[in-house]
């Protein structure tokens, strides 16, 4: 009789090393959950310098806004996020009952029971992308001026995608430039930024390619949305081969939403038509990981051109972990 040889269980199977694992000890500290890490001074110094570099390319007339890591649940629901990415959403919950009900939940916890059954959702969600809060703000200002509006936005974001890979965090930073205007306004904006972003990546010494892409829409209907998005070339990504050419990591994206947000929020362009929107998004943590993977964790050994662009000057006594570089 033939006996099937079963593979190792997940608990006993050997863990396959990831090409980015060698960076973990220098850049992060575990916080008990995959994709959520404390970040070292070495790592943050590069994130901050990348942010400054992106700021230096900001177009004139662009309004800067910085958002907290949470946003209105009602606004995100209205934006249509639940129809496209319900599996990625993180909601804020709390103990909202009476004093007696809250004490009962605490008592269950003390007794080893499940206190979370008493949780109920708040009016907040964790922001899944930096640009969502800007559209109702723009809508509150009335019809757009000729040429539209441009925003520079940033936020700490969250998507429920637990992973041990350092380029797929659950909690991450996103920086975006957003354009709201006519179709021509948005098309020209995206073309400018696709050229500009590739120049930034080249200056940083990164190997990359740009290709059309789709968002990770949920379910079978989502698969059809993804096909349509690619066919219409509504999304492009700047891909860096951190693991391989076949499985590159998207570190920037260039998105055209058409009139979706204009119609949703009642934003009218200068011609009285529903405004079109687009954005260029920089995954700040993915870019930082790409820099360390490409150039190493010794900042003094980075190419001179890259050090100059980022403003990295050697301190008289550089620390062992690169903290002497400012």
Curated annotation (Swiss-Prot):
**InterPro entries named among the record's database cross-references:** aa-tRNA-synt_IIb, aa-tRNA-synth_II/BPL/LPL
Keyword annotations: ATP-binding, Ligase, Metal-binding, Nucleotide-binding, Zinc
Q: Which residues bind Zn(2+)?
A: 131, 176, 279
Q: What's the catalysed reaction?
A: an L-alpha-amino acid + holo-[ACP] + ATP = an L-alpha-aminoacyl-[ACP] + AMP + diphosphate
Q: Which GO terms describe its molecular function?
A: aminoacyl-tRNA ligase activity; ATP binding; metal ion binding
Q: Which cofactor does it need?
A: Zn(2+)
Q: Which residues bind an L-alpha-amino acid?
A: 176
- Uppermost EC category: ligase
**E.C. numbers:** 6.2.1.n2
Oligomeric state and partners?
Answer: Homodimer.
User: What family is it from?
Assistant: Belongs to the class-II aminoacyl-tRNA synthetase family. Amino acid--[acyl-carrier-protein] ligase subfamily.
* Function text: Catalyzes the ATP-dependent activation of L-glycine and its transfer to the phosphopantetheine prosthetic group covalently attached to the vicinal carrier protein bsr0959 of yet unknown function. May participate in nonribosomal peptide synthesis or related processes. L-alanine is a poor substrate whereas L-serine or D-amino acids are not substrates for ATP-dependent activation. Does not display tRNA aminoacylation activity.
User: What else is on record for this protein?
Assistant: Lacks the N-terminal tRNA-binding domain compared to class-II aminoacyl-tRNA synthetases.
Its protein name is Amino acid--[acyl-carrier-protein] ligase 1
């Amino acid at each position: 009789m033939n006996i099937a040889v079963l593979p190792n269980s997940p608990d006993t199977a050997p863990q396959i090393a990831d090409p980015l694992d060698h960076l973990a000890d220098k850049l992060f500290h575990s916080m008990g959950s995959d994709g959520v890490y404390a970040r070292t001074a070495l790592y943050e110094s590069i994130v901050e310098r990348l942010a400054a570099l992106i700021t230096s390319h900001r177009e004139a007339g662009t309004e800067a806004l910085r958002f907290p890591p949470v946003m209105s649940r009602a606004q995100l629901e209205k934006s249509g996020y639940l129809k496209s990415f319900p599996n990625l959403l993180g909601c804020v919950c709390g103990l909202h009952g009476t004093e007696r009900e809250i004490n009962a939940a605490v008592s269950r916890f003390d007794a080893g029971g499940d206190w979370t059954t008493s949780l109920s959702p708040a009016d907040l969600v964790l922001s899944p992308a930096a640009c969502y809060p800007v559209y109702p703000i723009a809508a509150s200002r009335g019809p757009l001026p000729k040429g539209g509006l441009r925003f520079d936005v940033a936020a700490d974001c969250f998507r429920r995608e637990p992973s041990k890979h350092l380029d797929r965090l659950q909690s991450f930073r996103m920086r975006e430039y957003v354009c709201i205007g006519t179709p021509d306004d948005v098309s020209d904006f995206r073309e400018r930024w696709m050229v500009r972003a590739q120049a930034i990546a080249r200056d940083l010494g990164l190997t990359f390619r740009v290709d059309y892409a789709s968002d990770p829409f949920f379910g079978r209907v989502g698969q059809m949305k993804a096909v349509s998005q690619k066919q219409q070339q509504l999304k492009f990504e700047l891909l860096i081969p951190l693991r391989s050419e076949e499985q590159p990591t998207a570190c920037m994206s260039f998105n055209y939403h058409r009139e979706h947000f204009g119609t949703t929020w009642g934003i009218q362009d200068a011609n009285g038509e529903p405004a079109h929107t687009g954005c260029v998004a920089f995954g700040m943590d993915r870019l930082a990981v790409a820099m360390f993977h490409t150039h190493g964790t010794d900042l003094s050994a980075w190419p001179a051109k890259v050090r100059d662009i980022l403003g990295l000057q050697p301190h008289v006594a550089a620390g062992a972990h690169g903290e002497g570089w400012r």
